[in-house]
Amino acid sequence: WFYEDVLGLKLAAAMAFDHLSGTDKRIEYMHIFFEMVDGNYIAFFDDPYNAPSNFFVDMNGFDSHVAVEVESMEHLKAIESKLNSIHWDSFIIDHEFVTSLYIFDPNGIQLEFTCRALDHDKIMAEDASKAHQEIKDWTERTRSLKEEKFGENSLAKK
């Protein structure tokens, strides 16, 4: 209901399966697709047999979230208005290159709706020119913390 009724996306498909595609493993699940305005899809698996009991707890948005661009501030404000009308928590942050509206969906997944700032392309082009060096510097600065927290073997897989 949330993706259709609140966010206005079209339910494009709901496919129920009794085995894991490409394997002989028997498992019942559903793959649900919602079509976005640009023709792309956001899709979810519904696997109640294997979902952990804390599945619906909000996830840390810094760890993982889905960002979707909207075409205008008016569209962003319309989403915010719709959310406010059903008393759904949301907040807006001006990141300078985009303005973002953040929410958690009913599954606990953080969603971000963004609208580009007028100088978005200029800001992104400037950042692109130094992006590889920024990642290198960040990796060097945080490597020991990550090794301590996750273990060197875990990081070697990334």
Predicted regions and their residues:
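Ligand-binding pocket scaffold of soluble enzyme catalytic domains
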Residues: 10-13, 74, 86
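Vicinal oxygen chelate
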Residues: 33-37, 54-158
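A short acidic/small-residue loop/turn micro-motif
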Residues: 19, 49, 117-120
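Histidine- and/or cysteine-centered catalytic micro-motif in compact active-site loops
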Residues: 16, 47-49, 71
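Core segments of cupin and vicinal oxygen chelate
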Residues: 1-41
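Short glycine-/small-residue motifs
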Residues: 41-44, 112-113
